[in-house]
Amino acid sequence: MNNSTSHSLAVKTPLSRLYLALFSAPLLLLSPADFARAADAIFDGDSRITETLGYTGDVYVGRNQRGNLLIDNGKITAYNINIGRLFDGQIYESVVTVRGPNAELNAVNDQYVLRGDLNLGLGTLRVEEGALASAKEIVVGTTRGYDSHLIATGAGSRVTS
């Protein structure tokens, strides 16, 4: 008696695996290039962060509507950070303020190629009162035709790349 069960869609031969790979590869190309993954965080509207938050994905501020994010002596770390970025033909003016000596906004700076970007589209990043914003690469003006601003004020405020 054979106790193993086999699903009717199970791939049983190497040739079937090849067909499955050829069939599924174009499906990946049909999805939008800029879709949110489950690990991504989206801050639309007004938000205030006073704690440490880490994301194993990207952070979007102002993705579906205007975003206004205040990091008040809190910390956000994510793979990439996008402020006021064009999505699905729409762009919303957004502001991120990082305020206080313990406040940080960090895009992960590691050896992986697709991590570490801080992108400003139609957005403003304000670093105030001793706060820190850091990324492997900071791009101000990612979207042609829209204004972006990066402002650091106050003693000890830092922007590093």
What are these regions (language model features)?
Residues M1-L15:
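N-terminal secretory signal peptides that target proteins for export/translocation
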Residues Y19-L22, P26-S161:
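Beta-strand-rich extracellular passenger or scaffold domains
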